[in-house]
């Protein structure tokens, strides 16, 4: 038996790649300096994996921004608008990821979507009529050669053709089948080039196989692979799946002329059942047995019990998915040993794979005994009062009265907002000064009084600016918050916070998910102080800003000893208490963000309601069910596919919902219209995840497109998302254009 991983974190132990890349974006270092730093980081990571005793090391799992974008460049799926710019290859790459606005042209970034049911986001390639798929890139070969020069025979990794086609966008008049033959040739060219360099195997990632597949999709998969595998150029080919099981294509998959198949034994409900039904003796099974998405220690006894039931003769132990979804290492954390011993980040998961392999080979008795001892400990007790509160909930606790239509009329009369009311999503730019003051306060270098005075001053500035430029509903800017989940978690019992537990979310952006350690209750009011202060500075309504229970759960590392449903209800009651305190303090518009509602939706439609929506939607309703009818509840969602769960979103029973929409060309509007969506909506009118400022007329056109699909009485005008990561200059320029466009649109109503 041997060991491997599907992929390793890219940003570095201390987010070195992030900080170096951001220096490049600011023109503080050259492209050559960026590439050299990335090369050093890859070597460091390969060496860590090697020293931990992992026998098969992947390469090309690294990325400067996103591995899906890497594949687009590898296969020449690059829009003509970017090719026509006089930019270097690296500049083109970042233009697709972030947009480009300069002397050489103006192009928007490609759309960004959630990577299956994770908090990672991938850049969505677009096939045009002019797209000519071919082998065009060199990164996969360069990185294989880099590793080889270090004495490492790695297994190059690339997105497989089926997943690439399934997750890409297509221009009107273009479809996936148009590119099958060219993809077959391109992948075989990759095989040939790798074989020429001395590679012996390749990993093709096909997570799209774990979703519900139609007959046409299965036919596409088989057509691609029967032809690609007809000439493997001497390479051993591994088809790697993750995030679930492959029940729809298992029999077809095991009968392909492939050398190895990677299956997920952590999230794959039916994986063990499928394999027990038979696995070919001539193929190697890569068994994903160590959870790549959560940070709890692996229970060796449970994992070994699964492995003992696998009939495959040749097994390689691996992670259930890439380790980019967990932090780098626990070595830099400051938890007490009694706590820290329960956690395994990416580096520690390498140890777990090595331990399991050793135990399977009749060694490792000491590590097995230590693991048994760890799991024999009762980690944390239950909060009896909280459990009783949840047990006492009834249907009435999940129902807001009066119904939406009556509330809508009451609120329009109460607020007297103009048509197309304008607002922002919540946060304003957090400058170096803001971050420095927060850090100084946390280090006790700044007193509470000094910090409060600073926050009051900056809130005053932004309230005044919003009033001057003409926003209808204001926000306080969230300057006191480092992260929309961590900030709340710090005021809830049952939460722990890592010092360096960063995980890549998109591009160079990292998030530091808190850890749900025990039962969750609110310790004290969280947002009332600054929301009330901001409201006292203006006669216009100021939104209270909260993170919803499902998002807090989904953007935390959840417990594994109770269900995520029970954890979410605990969080919902804590946020409900905060909502009622805000309302009592005179905050009449309260936004409860559910940015991650879609994130943990099961990948198979048959599981959507029973396994998720049947408790996630009620959890949100529980939060706001008892507010007064003239209190307006907003929510916000971003960077996910929402069109297939529109009825469930309407059932949240919010009064207003804002969506990310600009990068996806407002595709959600047709579905809102078709589903007779009742909630008032604010489709984002410009993309905030790019530093690009909308051109004159651009937002006007977007608003026209919105009003063609949604009645003006139902429309709000807002950006896509919060503005925390943007610069002040670009933010004010973009928001001014938003307001000008909204005012112009009102004149035409």
Curated annotation (Swiss-Prot):
Gene Ontology terms: biological process: methionine biosynthetic process; methylation
Binding site for Zn(2+): 636, 638, 660, 721
Xref: Pfam families: Meth_synt_1, Meth_synt_2
Statement: the UniProt record of this protein carries the keyword Magnesium: no
EC numbers on record: 2.1.1.14
Family: Belongs to the vitamin-B12 independent methionine synthase family.
PANTHER family found in the cross-reference section: 5-METHYLTETRAHYDROPTEROYLTRIGLUTAMATE--HOMOCYSTEINE METHYLTRANSFERASE
NCBIfam families assigned: met_syn_B12ind, PRK05222.1
Protein name stated in the entry: 5-methyltetrahydropteroyltriglutamate--homocysteine methyltransferase
Gene, per the UniProt record: metE
């Amino acid at each position: 038996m041997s060991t491997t991983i599907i992929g390793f974190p890219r940003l570095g132990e201390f987010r070195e790649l992030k900080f170096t890349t951001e220096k490049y974006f600011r023109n503080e270092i050259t492209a050559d300096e960026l590439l050299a730093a990335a090369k050093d980081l890859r070597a460091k990571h390969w060496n860590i994996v090697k020293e931990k005793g992992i026998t098969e090391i992947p390469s090309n799992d690294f990325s400067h921004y996103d591995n899906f974008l890497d594949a687009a460049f590898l296969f020449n799926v690059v829009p003509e608008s970017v090719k026509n710019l006089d930019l270097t290859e690296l500049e083109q790459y970042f233009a697709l990821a972030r947009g480009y606005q300069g002397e050489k042209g103006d192009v928007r970034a490609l759309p960004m979507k959630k990577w299956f049911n994770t908090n990672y986001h991938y850049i969505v390639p677009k096939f045009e009529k002019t797209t000519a798929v071919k082998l065009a890139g060199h990164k996969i070969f360069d990185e294989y050669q880099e590793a080889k020069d270090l004495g490492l025979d790695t297994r190059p990794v690339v997105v497989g053709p089926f997943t690439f086609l399934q997750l890409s966008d297509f221009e009107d008049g273009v479809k996936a089948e148009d590119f099958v033959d060219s993809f077959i040739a391109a992948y075989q060219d990759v095989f040939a080039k790798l074989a020429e360099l001395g590679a012996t195997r390749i990993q093709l990632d096909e997570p799209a196989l774990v979703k519900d597949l139609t007959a046409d999709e299965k036919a596409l998969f088989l057509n691609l692979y029967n032809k690609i595998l007809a000439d493997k150029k001497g390479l051993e080919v591994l088809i790697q799946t993750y995030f679930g099981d492959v029940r729809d294509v298992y029999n077809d998959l095991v009968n392909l002329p492939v050398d190895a198949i990677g299956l997920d034994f952590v999230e794959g409900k039916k994986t063990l059942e499928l394999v027990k039904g038979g696995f070919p003796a001539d193929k190697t099974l890569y068994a994903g047995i160590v959870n790549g998405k959560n940070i709890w220690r692996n229970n060796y006894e449970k994992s070994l019990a699964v492995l003992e039931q696998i009939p495959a003769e040749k097994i390689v132990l691996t992670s259930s998915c890439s380790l980019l979804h967990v932090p780098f290492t626990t070595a830099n954390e400051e938890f007490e040993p009694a706590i820290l011993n329960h956690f395994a980040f990416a580096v520690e998961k390498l140890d777990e794979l090595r331990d399991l392999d050793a135990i399977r080979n009749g060694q490792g008795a000491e590590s097995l005994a230590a693991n048994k001892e760890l799991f024999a400990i009762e980690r944390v007790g239950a909060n009896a009062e909280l459990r009783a509160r949840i047990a006492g909930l009834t249907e009435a606790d999940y129902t807001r009265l009066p119904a939406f239509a009556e509330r809508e009329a009451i609120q329009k009369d109460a607020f007297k907002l103009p048509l197309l009311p304008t607002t922002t999503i919540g946060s304003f730019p957090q400058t170096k000064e803001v971050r420095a003051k927060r850090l100084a306060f946390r280090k006790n270098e700044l007193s509470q009084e000094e910090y409060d005075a600073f926050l009051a001053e900056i809130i005053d500035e932004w309230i005044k600016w919003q009033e001057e430029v003409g926003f209808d509903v204001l926000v306080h800017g969230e300057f006191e918050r480092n992260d929309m989940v961590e900030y709340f978690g710090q005021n809830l019992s049952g939460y722990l916070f890592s010092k360096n537990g960063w995980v890549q979310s998109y591009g160079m952006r990292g998030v530091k998910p808190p850890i749900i350690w025990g039962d969750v209750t609110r310790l004290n009011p969280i947002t009332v102080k600054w929301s009330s202060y901001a409201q006292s500075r203006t006669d216009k309504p100021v939104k209270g800003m909260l993170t919803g229970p499902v998002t807090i759960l989904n953007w935390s590392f959840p417990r594994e000893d109770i269900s995520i449903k029970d954890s979410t209800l605990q969080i919902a009651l804590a946020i409900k208490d905060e909502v009622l305190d805000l309302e009592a303090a005179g905050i009449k518009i309260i936004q409860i963000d559910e940015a991650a509602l879609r994130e943990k939706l099961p990948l198979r439609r048959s599981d959507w309601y029973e396994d998720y929506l049947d408790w996630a939607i009620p959890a949100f309703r529980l939060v706001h069910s008892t507010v007064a009818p003239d209190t307006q509840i907003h929510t916000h969602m971003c960077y996910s596919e929402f069109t297939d769960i529109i009825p469930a979103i309407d059932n949240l029973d919010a009064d207003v919902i804002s969506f990310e929409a600009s990068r996806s060309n407002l595709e959600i509007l047709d579905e809102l219209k078709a589903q007779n969506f009742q909630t008032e909506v604010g489709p984002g009118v410009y993309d905030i995840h790019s530093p690009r400022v909308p051109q004159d007329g651009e937002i006007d056109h977007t608003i026209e497109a919105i009003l063609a699909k949604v009645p003006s009485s139902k429309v709000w005008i807002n950006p896509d998302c919060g503005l925390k990561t943007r610069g002040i200059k670009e933010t004010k320029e973009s928001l001014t254009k938003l307001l000008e466009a909204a005012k112009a649109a009102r004149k035409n109503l």
